[in-house]
Structure formats: C-alpha cells, structure tokens
Amino acid sequence: MGIDVPLFRQMTPMGHRLSSTRPNYMTSIRLKSTIPHVGRVDLTNSKTMVHVSGRDAAKLLNGLFTLPVSSGAATPFSGVFGAFLNGKGRVITDAFLYTTSNHTEEDQSFVIEFDKAVEDELLLHLKRHRIRAKVKMEKLTDYECIFIWNRDATPDYWRRENECDSGFFQSLCEVAWSVAEVGETSEVEEKNGEPAQKPLYGLLVDDRYPLLGIRMILPAKTSTTYFSAIPSANLTQYNMLRYIRGTPEGSREIPPNKALPMESDLDYMNGLDFNRGCYVGQELTIRTHHTGVVRKRIVPFQLYQEGQEPGEYECQYDPELSGALPPLLDGSNVISLNSQPEERTFASSPFDSPKKEAEPKSEEAASEGGVPSWAKPKETDAAESNLPNKPKPVKLGNILSHHGNVGMALVRLDKIMQQQDIQLAVELPPGPNGEVNYLRAKLYYPLFVTDVSEAEAEAEAELEMERVRKEETHKNGQL
C-alpha cells in the first residue's frame, strides 16, 4: 500500500490541566507485573479476517476505508490501522488493512482484520458497495492473527522503513519477511493440486501508539514454530496493555453505528487522514475536524479506594481491589461528586493526583449495612435532599470495558473542563438496603499525547468557540 503515516507524529487532544513535566513512554510498576515485557498473543478467536483480491480491490477499499489504499507493490510494513464508516459518518468497525505478501498491481491482494462481533455487518457493507467491481471476497479460516510486543523497545527498532533496524525486532522482522520472500521465490510445492501456503501472509506495525507492537497473519498453528522464543500471552494481558496505552479497539469500546471517529480517538491513533479524497462517511468527519467541537473522548481510567493514592501519570492495576469489584461494570456511569456534602480536597483536574487525602473512616462505619469499606454510600439525608439549591451528581460518561480496576471510558470532556476541583467516581450496583455506592475514579491522558501545553490551548480555544456560539444564538433569539 502506498501510504506513509509518520509513526511518531505528535498528537494533541482536547486538553486538560495536566503537568507538562510528566515523562513520556512511562509504564506503571504495578501493571508491569501483569504484562510481560515481551509477549505473543493469538487474536484469532476474537477476530475475523477477510481476503479482498482482484483487479479493483484497491479501488473498492479506497472508497470505504478512512486511509488511502494504493495498488502499489507490497513492502514489509505496508499495512495500516483505520476504520469503515457508514453513510452518516459513524464507525462500523475499526480495522487493520494488510497488503499480502503475494500482492501485485495486476493481482491486488489485501486482508482486513476486524472484530468478529461485526462480521456480518461489515461483509454486507463491502458487498453493498462492490457493484460491478472485479473483486473477490472470502473469509480466511485457515490463518491466525498474531500480535507481538516488546515494552523495552526504543524508537530505533520501529522506524517505518522497508526493513527493521538492529535490535530485538531486527531478527523478528528478518525472519518473518524473509520467510515470505522464500515462499515467493522458491520452487512451488504442489500439494493436492494446490500451491503450498506461504508462511507469512501479512505484516504491519501497529502504530496506534508508538512502540505498541507488530501484527502478522500466518497459516494456522505456525506462529509457535517461527516465534517459539517469544513467550505466549493471553487476551487479558493484551487488553491491559491497550488500556494503559489508551488505544480503544473492537465493538465493546467502539460501538458499531453509534461511535464517531474522533470520539473514538481514531485521529490520535493514525486512523484518519484529513487530506485524502472522498470515502463513505467522510463529509461529517471532515466538517467536525475543521469546524466542530469534539466533546467526548475515550480515555483510560483507574478506580481506587477512598484515601488511596492513584497512579500519577497512568493507571495502576490493583489485584486486591479488582477481586472485590462486581464482575460487570461495563456501562456504569462516570459521575462528578462535587455536589456531595462531605468536605474533600482534590486536584484541579481529574488528570492530576489528589493534593490531600480524604479523612479516613472507621471500618465499622464504612462496612455498615453490608457495604464494603472501599464503596462508600452517598448520604441521602431527607432534610438536605429537599434543599432547592442542592445540585445532584452529574453524569459525565460511562465505562466501555475494563479488567478489574483499570479500563476505558467515554466521557464528556467539555463538562469536565468547566468544573474546578472536580471529583470523579463510578457508580456501583446498589447495596443490600438500596443505597447507591460509588468508587473513586481518575482519568488519564493516553500516553501517546505528548504536547500537553498545545492540548490545553486547543481546549481553551474550543471552550471560547462554544461561548461565542451561545452568545450569537442568544442575540439571534432576541432579534
């Protein structure tokens, strides 16, 4: 594919009051203990792989994918992350698009890797737009999708070139792509009248976050043969790696036909190109980019106990707290506690650490009514609840996915920016007496966001734009 997306492009979100002195590419000590430094995970059971081939394959995909697709010759890293949108600009699914090892300009060959939960919908979307294009589409059932990471890698290992630099990934990439080269140039072994499978079918750098990892498509059950030296990992460890990196993925975190591309951080993860030609869903996306305000974003979060110190720069996994949490928190509300009567001193932003811990409460008081000590019930005094000026907690978003006390949430950043000394929490299931419980929460910048000062300036500009818009609306209403 003829696309050149800079791997280390600086990305700036709608900002918040965050210290600009924080380190980059820092990983939590507690989370390190659960995620191996080097790992290999098989994603085949959660993914669908569709092979799109034929003379018009690039033309078809170029009109549907959020990044440009070229019919040019394949290179070792000629694959990209992007999305397919519907006509209203909503995300059908995020996806990885590989140029396969046997791709040529005359016989184009691509593989789409995406969430298995939206398989039928995306296949219908592709067939609806195929019309008379010379394209063949089929599911790959005898291949596996492998993700490999090395958290000790440096940028020198990951330059987006036709070959890897020296270091850990040099041997990995050389083995992977040289195997594909041998498969193409050696004598074809006939087996039951069909050519033997090439050991490597697709390879790309997962550049949603710098140094995140590489993805490849191999014939089934061959990854252990070629990459046996890399420790095997599980899907939970892969998801936790994504949580700390702030990279949403799949239908749980990017709901089909509901999520908007920039609310889903596709622009931060190199998944959008605002300078390319037309594709389905482009109009709303481009208009939002140039004239609109992105009020929601998906961000990592950490739940922590009353009086506990959360991670300063990124979420920390707490096994003890995670074991005590209800099993299903997906969909739970993220709320502001600023309306609570208890005295609390917190940082000026949900992205900063608390300046002062809340006063500790006795175990007896905290566990009264069967409520665990880490889940403090909201006080609902009848006299106070009838006060006319007493505001209620404001819903700011909801949890999309989580593992224990860490995960991803979709939140209203515009409301968070408007509140000073904001205190955030996540609502838990009601207690035995019907009381509403909550657990403290902290939100984090995705770690690929490096220019905090520019992000803050962008946020202030968006708030000013919203203020001017309201004034104009008010004036027009008086005329």
Curated annotation (Swiss-Prot):
GO terms for cellular component: mitochondrial matrix. Residues 341-395 are annotated as: Disordered. It is found in: Mitochondrion matrix. Its main location: mitochondrion. Residues 353-364 have a biased composition (Basic and acidic residues). Residues 1-99 form a transit peptide. One of its GO terms (biological process) is iron-sulfur cluster assembly. NCBIfam families: ygfZ_signature. This is Iron-sulfur cluster assembly factor IBA57 homolog, mitochondrial. The gene is CAF17.
